[in-house]
From Swiss-Prot:
Annotated source species: Acanthamoeba polyphaga mimivirus (APMV)
Record protein name field: Uncharacterized protein L74
Family stated for the protein in its record: Belongs to the mimivirus L74/L77/R857 family.
Length: 238
């Protein structure tokens, strides 16, 4: 996109807003930046400069809206902390310091660019045999790492579930502290927290099933290794 030196460029950036440590709504910040403080982003797929994104510094947040373009009232930012995906805290009138990647078009969004992590769990069957003890130990270490990772993910989901539940219960109280014309955003948050509670509950149940499966497999392989090493020690002693 062509820019004029010394002109003001309007851009957009996705942000997320938190109840405690849990993301309860995603919004879009409108930003202004002097064209002299911008630079193009090269698109390696097209071999040209991107027509949808640009880099910017000394960026000012002018307003924040919902994804369906309703302006979020200023009082909202007294109740919730919002930030970019690059961890800049934002509110109307704030400066963005660490985030440099922005969009020209409000219909583009880095929220749409998020990828779903691939399942890296190795479900290969391993034969529990003394002839394969090195492979079994390697499998045990892999299961132990997956178990630790899944444990922290499970605990994190529990915390999110508690936050969504508390958010839903407390939102009417928060809404009552604000003007009638601003209450709509808090009711939307309440609906989000209710919906996300059940989504997180489904995730938690799935994590619980995986967690139990990993624990059983880890215990089975670990017990085999202990028996093998005990048997080897007895043979040496004998």
């Amino acid at each position: 996109m062509k820019r004029n030196t010394g002109s003001t460029i309007t851009g957009y950036k996705a942000i997320k807003c938190f109840y405690k440590t849990t993301n309860v709504i995603e919004l879009r910040a409108t930003i202004n930046v002097d064209s002299d403080d911008t630079s193009p982003i090269f698109d390696y797929e097209t071999g040209k400069h991107s027509q949808s994104t640009f880099n910017g510094t000394d960026v000012l947040v002018t307003k924040i809206k919902t994804l369906d373009c309703q302006k979020v009232p200023d009082n909202f930012f007294k109740e919730f902390q919002c930030m970019t995906y690059d961890f800049d805290k934002v509110s109307p009138g704030s400066k963005i310091e660490y985030t440099h990647h922005f969009y020209y078009n409000k219909n583009d969004s880095d929220m749409d660019k998020k990828t779903v992590p691939k399942n890296t769990s190795n479900t290969d069957v391993i034969i529990l045999s003394s002839d394969n003890i090195d492979g079994i130990k390697e499998k045990y270490n892999q299961l132990a790492n997956e178990y630790d990772s899944e444990y922290f993910s499970y605990i994190s989901s529990q915390h999110h579930l508690e936050d969504f539940s508390e958010c839903y219960r407390n939102m009417d109280k928060i809404s009552d502290r604000n003007n009638a014309k601003d209450k709509w955003i808090f009711q939307r948050i309440k609906e989000n927290c209710r919906d996300k509670y059940y989504q997180e509950l489904d995730k938690l149940l799935e994590k619980e099933r995986k967690f139990i499966s990993l624990l059983n497999n880890k215990s089975q392989v670990g017990n085999f290794i202990l028996k093998h090493e005990s048997s080897t020690t007895n043979k040496i002693s004998g």
